[in-house]
């Protein structure tokens, strides 16, 4: 299993603060029952980072209002 590092995610979201916001927002969504966009059996925080590193989600999710 490949390990996800912050450097992998920083290639997609260069600002560390935006990266943290996007990862925590997505992890919260996953823990509330949203479907993951990548195949994983990890906890929501790791899954969120995997999605960011894969380019499945990005900072555009911070601009959306949950509905």
UniProtKB/Swiss-Prot annotation:
Q: Name one GO biological process term.
A: DNA-templated transcription
Does the keyword field hold Transferase? Answer: yes
Q: List the InterPro entries hit by this protein, alphabetically.
A: DNA-dir_RNA_pol_omega, Pol_omega/Rpo6/RPB6, RPB6/omega-like_sf
Which Pfam families did the record assign?
A: RNA_pol_Rpb6
Q: What is this enzyme's catalytic activity, as reactions?
A: RNA(n) + a ribonucleoside 5'-triphosphate = RNA(n+1) + diphosphate
Which residues lie in coiled coils?
A: none
User: What Gene Ontology cellular-component terms does the record carry?
Assistant: DNA-directed RNA polymerase complex
Q: Could you say which protein family the record assigns here?
A: Belongs to the RNA polymerase subunit omega family.
**Role:** Promotes RNA polymerase assembly. Latches the N- and C-terminal regions of the beta' subunit thereby facilitating its interaction with the beta and alpha subunits.
Protein name, as recorded: DNA-directed RNA polymerase subunit omega
Species of origin reads Leptothrix cholodnii (strain ATCC 51168 / LMG 8142 / SP-6)
């Amino acid at each position: 299993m490949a390990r996800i590092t912050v450097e992998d995610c920083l290639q997609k979201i260069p600002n560390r603060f935006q990266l943290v916001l996007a990862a925590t927002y997505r992890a919260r969504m996953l823990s509330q029952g949203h479907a993951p966009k990548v195949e994983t059996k990890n906890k929501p925080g790791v899954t969120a980072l995997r999605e960011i590193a894969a380019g499945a989600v990005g900072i555009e999710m911070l601009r959306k209002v949950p509905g």
